């Protein structure tokens, strides 16, 4: 069977537990993935923006830890994503920084309004900010995908007009 999964939180769980990707308690682990003929996974790096003072550092450290774990499984095909633009703080250069660390997809908003835009669980209105537009422009320049799964309706259409690679 061939599987392409666009989202799982395993990377965040591995980092919080400081465990190996083969840990049997993980919902998605190396043993589970080895049961499929072909498997491609998008691993979301996520944190609750209210839990950490420095989301950029936290996600950066998570990517580093996860990368050491995933390298033990060279047959696995995967993409690293970031869920929640809070990690970018207020600096569009952080898009470049995370791209250099292997991130190929960013979800601009999760469940909180941030400097980029407004999630659907907060309001259907509000769209994306000027900073959000700059983030999408930079992502386009780097051929990164914009995950629109949590953004509100207005933001969805504003992003869809601007992004070269939108997914929802």
Which sequence ranges carry the predicted segments?
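N-terminal hydrophobic targeting/anchoring segments and the immediately downstream early-domain regions
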Residues: 1-125, 130
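Histidine/acidic residue-rich metal-binding segments in metalloenzymes
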Residues: 92-100, 122-168
């Amino acid at each position: 069977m061939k599987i392409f999964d666009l989202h799982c939180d395993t990377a965040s769980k591995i980092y919080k537990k400081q465990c190996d990707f083969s840990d049997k308690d993980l919902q998605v682990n190396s043993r589970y993935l080895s049961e499929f003929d072909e498997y491609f996974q998008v691993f979301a790096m996520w944190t609750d923006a209210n839990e950490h003072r420095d989301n950029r550092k936290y996600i950066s450290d998570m990517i580093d830890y996860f990368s050491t774990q995933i390298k033990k499984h060279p047959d696995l095909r995967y993409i690293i994503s970031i869920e929640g633009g809070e990690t970018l703080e207020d600096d569009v250069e952080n898009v470049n920084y995370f791209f250099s660390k292997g991130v190929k997809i960013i979800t601009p908003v999760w469940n909180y309004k941030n400097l980029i835009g407004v999630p659907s669980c907060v309001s259907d209105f509000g769209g994306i900010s000027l900073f959000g537009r700059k983030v999408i422009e930079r992502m386009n320049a780097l051929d990164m995908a914009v995950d629109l799964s949590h953004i509100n309706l207005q933001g969805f259409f504003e992003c869809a007009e601007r992004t070269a690679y939108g997914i929802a």
